[in-house]
Amino acid sequence: MAKIAGVVDVGGPRADGWLVVMGTGKLWLVDPLGAATPYPGTYGDATTAEPYLTVVPQLPHAVLTSSAGCSFQRGDVYVLRLHAPLGLNRVDAQGQKSAFANIPNVTNLTGIAFDTGGAFGYRVLVTGTAGAGKSEVAAIDCAGTVSVITRSAPTVEGGLEVAPPSFGAFAGTLIAPDELSGNIYAIGADGTSRAVAASGLPKGSDIGVEAVGFVPHGWHGSVYYADRVTKGNPHPGTDNLLALTSDSLAGLGVQEGDLLSATEGGATLIDVRCTTTCTVQPIITSATKAHGEGHLIFTGATPIEPSPSPRASAQPATSGRTGDAPTVFLVAAVTAGLVVIVLAVLLVLRDLRAQGRG
């Protein structure tokens, strides 16, 4: 996996299997083999801040056009704008940047996610600081209209995600971590907040839980987490994307629909499973020198709905193609075997003819 200076978040994957990565105020694309290339266009923003991002996923056909008379375009990137006026920037697949929405009455923006469940109207969800110990949650539709869900949610920051239907009483809520308390919270579309679990991991500024992510349906790939270089910190980071495979986590008891949560300091990891009750299982408890930031992003999920018809693309091979490699090798091996058999038969026939002439 290529190094990306100042890597602070990762999003996607896009329809082509590529990840979108933010580093030092610039966007990058990372292909399924780990090679990084600059994102099209000239996007640039604050180089030392934490401009988290979200990539528009595949949406149900029924909601492609909203009541606002527009639609979110799959693969578009929405990035926190952390300078005045605070808000969101939109970057399309061609790299065109536009100011999408301003979010007033907050002093900072701390997290972003896309509502994949629909309880929030399939909108972009953003958290911001609304006062001492309080967060605002705002929902932004495809027209850039900002609606405040609540201004009294707990302090939260980092990689957020909406819970799937299988996540017990918290299904459809916005799941958000708080590094200071070490707690993981669920924020509902009605503005109410509840604690999902205490992480049991080290807590504090630049230490506690930073990211959450749900193990997707039919997962057979990897989960990625940005490891940012942070000089002078006990967890100095490497500017790489950290990765764990589905096989390695399945061997530790992680299942489809579970919530994973990772810390900022050391990238320790827990598994949270909620049905009628929630249980917390430590997965990685020994802190490393990693300095985690942003989202936990999974590749290699099996779509629940049929994917859109593939379109011609100038991009290199997608993750789906890399997954076909064993089939390619099998066909090659069978073909080689048949060639050997045919050659052997020809040699035998030649010898028999020679004996007949003798």
Name every feature range the model reports, one short phrase each.
Residues 306-316, 355-358:
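Intrinsically disordered, low-complexity Ser/Thr/Pro-rich tracts
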Residues 1-308, 312:
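Sequence/structural signature of beta-propeller domains
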Residues 308, 318, 347-350:
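Intrinsically disordered, low-complexity regions enriched in serine, threonine, proline
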Residues 93, 314, 324, 353-356:
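Sequence-pattern detector for short linear motifs
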Residues 335-358:
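C-terminal membrane-anchoring or membrane-association module
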Residues 310-336:
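Extracellular Ser/Thr-rich, low-complexity/disordered mucin-like segments
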